[in-house]
Amino acid sequence: MTQEKKKFDAEVGKILNLMIHSLYSNKEIFMRELISNASDACDKLRYLSQSNSELIAGDSNFKIIVKVDKDNGQIIIRDNGIGMNKEDLIENLGTIARSGTANFLKNLSGDSKKDNMLIGQFGVGFYSSFMVADKVTVTSRKAGESKVHTWESDGLGEYIVADSEQEFTRGTEIVLYIKKSETTFLDHFRLKHIVKSYSDHIAVPIYFCDEAGNNEIQLNSASALWTRPKSEITEDQYKEFYKSLSYAVDDPWVTLHNKNEGAIEFTNLLFIPSSKTFDLFHPDRKKRVKLYIKRVFISDENIDLIPSYLRFLRGVVDSEDLPLNISRESLQHNNVLEKIKNAITKRVLGELRKKKEELPEEYNKFWTNFGGALKEGLCEATTDHEKLLEVCIFRSALHNKMISIDEYIANFKEGQNTIYYLSGDNPDKLLSSPQIEGLLNKNIDVLLFTDTVDDFWVNVNSEYKGYAIKSATRSDIDVEQTTSQPKDKNTDSKKSDNEYKLLTDYFKEILGELVKEVKISKKLTLSPACLAVSDTAMDIRMERFLIEQKQIANASAKNLELNPKNKIIEKIFNDLKANNKNNNELVNLIFDQACILEGEPVADTGAFSKRLNDILQKAIL
């Protein structure tokens, strides 16, 4: 038997060291790489046999066999694919980053490229074996040839290639001599789990057998559901796949199975769960959409395949156009990935828009489960905010049901050009807020925002389809003129301020720095007073949230708006006109009440309690 000792290409030692110790963060993917290579070999031969059937004569059923020899510390992977001769072994295994598959693809043209599930884009996958093995031997016989050759290396810079006299059928056998520190990979259960996790949908059947080569058990389903036509898949099959993929107990609410053809080709099989996922808002949450390339699992981590706000999606995306980086664990940032992401996002939002219109009750349940996550996209600079807002729904204060902003606009009062909202923690409390009593009295609807994220997205989305989005806590809202045309607006606001200057000055004198300004309200109809902020100030709830998060130290002074039609305010005003200024405690109590209704802390709870007791005593006596 003749043999040759050769050195790897220049710098190969450094590259091997980098790859073994740094490039792969998950050692178990060595199995994925070797099985992928075996699958490539079978696909190559299947393609070539179309024009030369003699190549597979007597052995036309392609398969991959995995064995474990615990006594000798070996893992063996065997395929009956195209095999390699001596020159192939030197070219494909003796040179880092040279891929026989890549060269093979260059020789294909037309539709044959689509028909070959060839996944090796780089020549380093094989060398991931050295993460777990201190020696690797390869025995191979090329289809159509009679000679057998071996390749052997410890990964330290040299390899031996030799002729072999042993009897060997077509294909390749790889033997890994497992390191003592990695013997857990010799465990049958673990190895089976690895194969099923990464290679379940490889088209070539993968068998596991005992040391003697008996008792073959097929490990993979060898059938990627997403590659089959939708017309051939039943609803139960979709449900079964969803549950096995995501370990879910619920049924999917929506199934999206699409094949994208054109400049970029990919297939997606995506599911929207019917139940809320437990880790939706967990900081360590994992993405549940798996990336496959030609039916081989690549990753569900460190890939920007779907936007974060669609993280409730479950499923797979399979593409032939995605380039991989040299480790195949993380994708290069490129336009292809971005286009796939945009296409998926557009498809999902389109389906949600359809469900919102056709199945409003079911959509309400979906929104309860995932609306909070979906609205996070409104805070992202790269999101099409208008398209995303089209699928958002909010509780209507006027109708006490969930509606979209488009429905809100369709029900505008004549002359109305503003979308009003009020944010808070509890929708029932918001309904009784003095901030919206005047608007509701005029049949002007108000959207109730109850998620924390609402206070953030409205800061970057001040309008929708040309209509301003405004908080009902703003000081400049006039319910009498909010539906008037600009030409009809008059000077009532200034007249009211001047008329009640005695009243507002008195309140400001008593409250001092506790308030920024005291104004006559144009939106209150029943309550005596409320807090408000100017258009340029931070919303009250947003400020409170930032204080809780210690992002700002103290609350800013708010405006106090007074309702001159309220009996209490009217009495104070009449007393002032009679030169009676003995309502200081009542003024403070009105302010304290406004703070409480807005969820703001009372400046002095002891003084508040005393004032309340004094007024109650006077009322009794």
UniProtKB/Swiss-Prot annotation:
Localization terms from the record:
Cytoplasm
Cross-referenced Pfam families, in alphabetical order? HATPase_c_3, HSP90
Q: Which GO terms describe its cellular component?
A: cytoplasm
In residue numbers, the region (C) covers 545-621
Q: Name the keywords, alphabetized.
A: ATP-binding, Chaperone, Cytoplasm, Nucleotide-binding, Stress response
Keyword 4Fe-4S among UniProt keywords: no
Give GO terms: molecular function aspect only: ATP binding; ATP hydrolysis activity; ATP-dependent protein folding chaperone; unfolded protein binding
Q: Which domain of life is it from?
A: Bacteria
The region called B is annotated at 329-544
Region of interest (A), residue spans: 1-328
Q: Which SMART domains match?
A: HATPase_c (SM00387)
Indicate the principal place this protein occupies in or around the cell.
cytoplasm
User: Looking at the keywords, is Acyltransferase present?
Assistant: no
Q: What does this protein do?
A: Molecular chaperone. Has ATPase activity.
Summarize subunit and interaction data from the UniProt record for this chain: Homodimer.
Q: Which family does it belong to?
A: Belongs to the heat shock protein 90 family.
Under which name does UniProt file this protein? Chaperone protein HtpG
The species this protein was found in: Rickettsia prowazekii (strain Madrid E)
The gene designation is: htpG
